[in-house]
């Protein structure tokens, strides 16, 4: 069953990305966050990030920040919003698709960095499982997966009562081959600022943002 994405129109993006009272991140927030992501990815890869896949990219706003940080990096965005693709697709290299269909829309990897920010908690379990497996085939470096869970206090159109616990997502990552590795070696760091916790998996080179361990499991530091 395909999700109805028609509500991701200009009014939606105006409210959550531009309205000063409702927007979830400012341009300064985005610079700090992507700066952290790119720096961490390059530390793990021991080389510059040259290609980025942004899944659920919306209007492709991360592409403008990436251009400031790494002018030569190749950006590919994927989003289900017909409005976003029509308005920004050609200018920002955005293709129409979703996490679940990314394997069928001609996206060619591997990518040094895969971004999936504030998307996974909106995706149905079957599509999520399928999409994570597809991301694994496109990953050629680091994947940054940002998820809001039932243990989070989040703003925006996030519905906490429909969210899963951190341990549920961890299990999905393991089954998709995105977290566990043959060496069993993990390095976890706590990021400074905004009270956000990040797990950096050294061997499989995945960064996940999940809240501290609470009911149902999660991340321990």
Indicate where each model-derived feature is located:
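A conserved beta-strand element that flanks and buttresses the S-adenosyl-L-methionine
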Residues: 115
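Class I (Rossmann-like) S-adenosyl-L-methionine-dependent methyltransferase catalytic domain
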Residues: 1-107, 123-138, 142-221
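Short catalytic micro-motifs in class I SAM-dependent methyltransferases
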Residues: 118-122
